[in-house]
């Protein structure tokens, strides 16, 4: 079975083909991601209209590229999986419209995939013996959410951010330091030159199982205004506090839930410092963290998620749309 994955939830356009085989040789045949960082960096963040228009420009050429590299024809595709929630609504529309048009023309089924489900299942692409039940922590520019995933891939929300997502906090701190966008890799690189213990920063809602990063962000703004600390020390202290916050929240939730298997995914999971901090600190938790290319937005995870959900046969019809909110059910 050949599954086409399409991802356009934010500012990356991605296409992938996943081949499912019964002989344990299932694999991604080819995947491509077209980043829009150069289009948005001067604005200090993603401009939804620009993102949507660029998806429209890129989708067809990326599809042809993936088919060519996979040595497959469009008629070989058996199933189409497309991100349809949550995300930037205009960006989502472009991918969903493209997928539905392909499905209609080829007479092939289309599955709408929750972006957060894709992030979680990206770990299964790497760890062959990883199966639910497990817990999933998604840390990205739009989400900081902890879920329990049962053996039927039903998600139960355990904890979440009550304000800023962690990736959003990275972007805003970078912007306050006049370092540019996206903030994640910029802060990580600058922090290597700083002292992570130079500044004692607060952990938001430290006694709550939920996450909060707005207070941390505000505290850093006040420090920057005082102009008494070096940027690299601010970056290092912020990154340390972000990692410490994740660790403490996981341990706090572990008191109530049996968090013995934990997937950590999403764009912030590509941060090597945070990855090392949690891997070192959470010694009694089995961690599964995908490589960086699968932490950021990609179509590989969407194609694989479509494979996992195929048995539900909950296919999209032409009247179905995209949804920008997480409150929509996972399936």
Spans of model-derived segments:
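Conserved phosphate-binding catalytic cores of ATP/NTP-utilizing and phosphoryl-transfer enzymes
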Residues: 112-134, 304-305
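Adenine-nucleotide phosphate-binding core of ATP-dependent small-molecule kinases
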Residues: 207-214, 219-263
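Glycine-rich phosphate-binding/hydrolytic loop that grips phosphoryl groups
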Residues: 119-122, 290-331
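Glycine-rich beta-strand-to-loop/alpha-helix junction loops that act as flexible
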Residues: 82-85, 102, 140, 263-271
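N-terminal beta-alpha supersecondary unit
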Residues: 2-86, 115, 119
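Conserved phosphate-binding/catalytic loops in two-lobed NTP-binding clefts
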Residues: 112-113, 262, 279-302
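A short helix-loop
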Residues: 3-9, 16-21, 30-31, 130-132, ...
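Glycine-rich phosphate-binding loops at beta-strand->alpha-helix junctions
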Residues: 91, 259-278
